[in-house]
Structure formats: structure tokens, C-alpha cells
Amino acid sequence: MKMILALVVLGLVLVAAEDKYTTKYDNIDVDEILKSDRLFGNYFKCLVDNGKCTPEGRELKKSLPDALKTECSKCSEKQRQNTDKVIRYIIENKPEEWKQLQAKYDPDEIYIKRYRATAEASGIKV
């Protein structure tokens, strides 16, 4: 009986762990990436399938569709903060790149409609 209970608990822990994105890259300096046209360009090209991806770029690219679909429900607080920062930066400073990202990840404008009020409440004009 104890063995079965231990297996059930282990299973629940593993399922709970899968319900969050990895925090392995949470300490990346997002400001440094946004300040550098080269670094920003590399990540952007990765996301739109026009360039190679770093390991963290691959992880972002893999998680992005699910994060949009689930309203970032699996994101850590740091990931949410960085997401807001990056979206604000791209909208304000890289409108052409924003259009390309929207075309790839939200061509039917499903997510942008859902997030518009939340974004604008945070001071992000979408």
C-alpha cells in the first residue's frame, strides 16, 4: 500500500513539474538582448524560422505557441515579467518584426484579441 501511495505521489509530482516551463533560462539578461541589434536579430530569426536557434531560443520557440494558447499559465513570474518587457519593446521599437511574429504565431488574431485589454492595462498599446 505504501509503495502504491509513493508511486501516486511521484506521478503527481512529475505531472505538476510538467505544468510549468523550464526556469533554466529565467536569468537571461533580456535587456542586453533588446539593446543589441545582433542578439535581438538572432532570436527574432530563430522565432520566424529564418535562422539558427540557440538552446534558449529553441526553448522559447517550442513554448511560445502553448504560452499563447494558455495565457502563459505555465510561466514563472520572471517569464511573465520578461514577456511583458519584450512585447512592449517590440511593439514600440520594432513594428515590422511585431507584424511578422503576429503573422506566424497569431495569423487569425485569436490571441491578440484576447490579450488586448490586459496589455493595454499594462500600458502596452497593441
From Swiss-Prot:
Annotated Gene3D superfamilies:
Insect odorant-binding protein A10/Ejaculatory bulb-specific protein 3
Looking up SUPFAM superfamilies in the UniProt record yields:
Chemosensory protein Csp2
Sum up the protein's function in the record's words.
Answer: Protein component of the posterior mating plug.
Record InterPro entries? A10/PebIII, OS_D_A10/PebIII_sf
Q: In which tissues is it expressed?
A: Specifically expressed in the ejaculatory bulb and seminal fluid.
Q: Keywords, A to Z?
A: Behavior, Secreted, Signal
Q: Where is the signal peptide?
A: 1-17
What are its GO biological-process terms?
mating plug formation; metamorphosis; response to virus
For this chain, the family text in UniProt reads: Belongs to the insect A10/OS-D protein family.
Query: Its domain of life?
Result: Eukaryota
Name the principal localization, coarsely classed: secreted
Give one Pfam hit by family name: OS-D
Q: What is this protein called?
A: Ejaculatory bulb-specific protein 3
Subcellular localization, as worded in the UniProt entry: Secreted
Q: Which GO terms describe its cellular component?
A: extracellular region
